[in-house]
Structure formats: structure tokens, C-alpha cells
Curated annotation (Swiss-Prot):
Pathway: Amino-acid biosynthesis; L-leucine biosynthesis; L-leucine from 3-methyl-2-oxobutanoate: step 2/4. Its EC number is 4.2.1.33. One of its GO terms (molecular function) is 3-isopropylmalate dehydratase activity. One of its GO terms (biological process) is L-leucine biosynthetic process. This is 3-isopropylmalate dehydratase small subunit. SUPFAM superfamilies: LeuD/IlvD-like. The keyword Amino-acid biosynthesis applies. HAMAP family: LeuD_type2. Catalyzes the isomerization between 2-isopropylmalate and 3-isopropylmalate, via the formation of 2-isopropylmaleate. It is an enzyme of class 4 (lyase). It comes from Sulfurimonas denitrificans (strain ATCC 33889 / DSM 1251). Belongs to the LeuD family. LeuD type 2 subfamily. It catalyses: (2R,3S)-3-isopropylmalate = (2S)-2-isopropylmalate.
């Protein structure tokens, strides 16, 4: 494992944030990550890209990433600099797409206790999230080793290329 901790400021979103809210269908004519990043979450919060900083963390309600299957959603989040997404549950196809694109996501039932603006630290090795603002510590089930390897490689394509090269 490369990076054991993710530290960032929290941006809150509600439940059932679908892939069309993450990146609207009107932007799907491009697959250029930098272009997608300019419009991430704009239908949920038009100022999100202007307010957030690279390394910030989205904390949302249940069923994050529901709706249509589009790899553009995790690509846009990652390209915008979102370091991780935390929610009680994720739509299964988004869950898989996020790891395939190298975006760390974590399931935390108590995510509603984390407020917008809080500073948190995710310890991927030990399965803890520390809210530096409230001093609360939460436990989550660490992601499986193979999925951590996908994150470390930057996604499935990079992982496969590294395997082919024998790294």
C-alpha cells in the first residue's frame, strides 16, 4: 500500500446522489477528465468546483452514485481533486467504477455525524476515520487488498499495465 491516510475538508451531499448529479448528461460528449472536472456536482451545488480544493472529501447519504452506469462520474470526481467519497452505501455499479478509476470510497454508517467543513483523516490501513473537528473516531471495514492495489495504481487500466510490465 502506498498512501495510508487521506486528510481533507468535508463537503456534504444528501442521499440518492445519482450519476447525473455527479456529472450531468450534457457533458458526456467528452471523456477528457479535466473538462469533466469543471462540471462535477454542478447540478447538486453550482459552486462546488469553485469552493472545493484538491484533496477535499465528499461525505454523502445512502445510495451515492445511483442511476445510470457511467464511468464519467468517478473520473470527474477524481479529476476535480476529490480525494475520497464516504457514504453509508453506494450503488454497486458506481462502487465498482470508482475503484476501477482509482477513486477511494468508504462505507460508513455514521456518515451523517460528519458535518460540512469538518476536517477528517481516513486511515485506510486501520479502517478508521478521525474527525479532527469533533475528535470522534469511526471504524469502517478496510477495503480488500486487491481494491487497495487498484487505488494505489491509479485505477484498473494502470494496474493492468503495471502487471503486464511485471511491476
Amino acid at each position: 500500500m502506498q498512501k495510508a491516510n487521506i486528510d481533507g475538508k468535508v463537503w456534504r451531499f444528501g442521499k440518492d446522489i445519482d450519476t447525473d448529479l455527479i456529472i450531468a448528461a450534457r457533458y458526456l460528449s467528452t471523456s477528457v477528465p479535466e473538462e469533466l472536472a469543471k462540471h462535477v456536482m454542478e447540478d447538486a451545488d453550482p459552486q462546488f468546483v469553485k469552493k472545493m480544493s484538491s484533496g477535499d472529501i465528499i461525505v454523502a447519504g445512502e445510495n451515492f452514485g445511483c442511476g445510470s452506469s457511467r464511468e464519467h462520474a468517478p473520473i470527474a470526481l477524481k479529476a476535480a481533486g476529490v480525494a475520497a467519497v464516504i457514504a453509508p452505501t453506494f450503488a454497486r455499479i458506481f462502487y465498482r467504477n470508482a475503484f476501477n478509476m482509482g477513486l477511494p470510497i468508504f462505507e460508513l454508517q455514521e456518515s451523517a455525524e460528519i458535518a460540512e467543513g469538518d476536517e477528517i483523516s481516513v486511515d485506510m490501513n486501520n479502517g478508521t476515520i478521525t474527525n479532527k473537528t469533533s475528535s470522534k473516531v469511526y471504524k469502517f471495514i478496510p477495503i480488500p487488498q486487491f481494491m487497495q492495489e487498484l487505488i494505489d495504481a491509479g485505477g484498473l487500466m494502470n494496474f493492468a499495465q503495471n502487471e503486464i510490465k511485471g511491476k
